[in-house]
């Protein structure tokens, strides 16, 4: 039996930016529409996988937690074999799988997904890290298919200007899209779903 190749969506970003919150929200929004699964990456635990299971993102057998050890961005870039194996397992188990979300371990602004592992990349940063984050650049900011600027509700508390962040994101990314979100309240989620469907599934 031929195994369908799913759309692989890489979700990256610094620790605490909202990667797992985005993965959870996307699973809850899309699980009744598409056949989906998740691969998470943690250095020494399966904490993100357990969080998603606990919050009933998907059935537990649809979530594989990869323990990367050492440097988390190596597992999504230079040596993606563990992640590729997890994607292959899920593709076989739930054939025909539509989408696999691959969430990276907490990484820095220089981390990117291997093209072997991800068809579409979403990079999540958060307003609480300061308005200067978009202009710091790095491949996640400049080269990802979609930049998500999360936790916009915190802007007044940390003295961050969304206007400045928007201007810097536009300057750093050129034509590449970015979306402001408050994932706790679901704000911006539909725009992300629309992007995945249009760019990845060609709907």
Curated annotation (Swiss-Prot):
Quaternary structure (record): Homodimer. UreD, UreF and UreG form a complex that acts as a GTP-hydrolysis-dependent molecular chaperone, activating the urease apoprotein by helping to assemble the nickel containing metallocenter of UreC. The UreE protein probably delivers the nickel.
GO cellular component, one term: cytoplasm
A Pfam family reported for this protein in Swiss-Prot or TrEMBL: cobW
GO biological process, one term: urea catabolic process
InterPro entries: CobW/HypB/UreG_nucleotide-bd, P-loop_NTPase, UreG
Protein name, UniProt field: Urease accessory protein UreG
Keyword Nucleotide-binding found: yes
Statement: the UniProt record of this protein carries the keyword Disulfide bond: no
Subcellular location: Cytoplasm
Family, per entry: Belongs to the SIMIBI class G3E GTPase family. UreG subfamily.
Keywords, alphabetical: Chaperone, Cytoplasm, GTP-binding, Nickel insertion, Nucleotide-binding
């Amino acid at each position: 039996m031929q195994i369908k190749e799913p759309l692989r969506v890489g979700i990256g970003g610094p620790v605490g930016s909202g990667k797992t919150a985005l993965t959870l929200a996307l699973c809850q929004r899309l699980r009744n529409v598409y056949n989906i699964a998740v691969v998470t990456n943690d250095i020494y635990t399966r904490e993100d996988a357990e969080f998603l299971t606990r919050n009933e993102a998907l059935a537990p057998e649809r979530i594989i937690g990869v323990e990367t050890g050492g440097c988390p961005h190596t597992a999504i870039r230079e040596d993606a074999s563990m992640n590729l194996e997890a994607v292959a397992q899920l593709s076989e188990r739930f054939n025909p799988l539509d989408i696999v979300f691959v969430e990276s371990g907490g990484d820095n602004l220089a981390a990117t997904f291997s093209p072997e592992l991800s068809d579409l990349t979403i990079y999540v940063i958060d307003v609480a890290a300061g308005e200067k984050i978009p202009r710091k650049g790095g491949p996640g900011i400049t080269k990802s298919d979609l930049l998500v600027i999360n936790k916009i509700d915190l802007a007044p508390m940390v003295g961050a200007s969304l206007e400045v962040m928007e201007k810097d994101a536009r300057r750093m990314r050129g034509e590449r899209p970015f979306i402001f979100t408050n994932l706790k309240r679901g704000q911006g989620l539909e725009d992300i779903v629309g992007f995945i469907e249009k760019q990845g599934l060609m709907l």
